[in-house]
Amino acid sequence: MERDKGVAPIVVENVAYNEQVVSFVRNLTSSFFGCAAGILGLTSYEGLALYVLGYFFVSFLLFALKMRGNLTKYYQPGYKFWIAKILDGAPSYVLTWTLFYSLVYVYE
């Protein structure tokens, strides 16, 4: 019935899988950004800014390259992709940020 009207059905399992994959990519890249912040010696708001910029950069790359600009095909509400899980990668980021900062700058 939905296909007759030209509307693609939304399958909940597919949307949940897409969210899981995006969450995995963001968590993995947040660790890499944490390593970069630690090696660069960023502290305080500079490190926080790198996390936020990195989060949105990775989100934009996923949106542009993998989704080809068609967000509604993979997610129901559009805002959820951009800001809903911004804090999920923060623990990984902070852990690797402090680890690499202490490894590089321990003798200063």
Swiss-Prot record:
What are the transmembrane regions?
A: 21-41, 45-65, 86-106
Q: Show the InterPro entries listed in the entry.
A: Emc6, EMC6-like
Q: Give the highest taxon in the source lineage.
A: Eukaryota
Q: What is its main location?
A: endoplasmic reticulum
Protein's membrane topology: Multi-pass membrane protein
Query: Which UniProt keywords are listed?
Result: Endoplasmic reticulum, Membrane, Transmembrane, Transmembrane helix
Biological process terms from the Gene Ontology for this record are: autophagosome assembly; protein insertion into ER membrane
The cross-references to Pfam families, in alphabetical order and at most eight, read:
EMC6
Any idea where this protein resides? Endoplasmic reticulum membrane
Task: Offer a single GO CC term for the protein.
Answer: endoplasmic reticulum
Indicate the family of this protein: Belongs to the EMC6 family.
The name this protein goes by in its record: ER membrane protein complex subunit 6
Which species is the source of this protein? Schizosaccharomyces pombe (strain 972 / ATCC 24843) (Fission yeast)
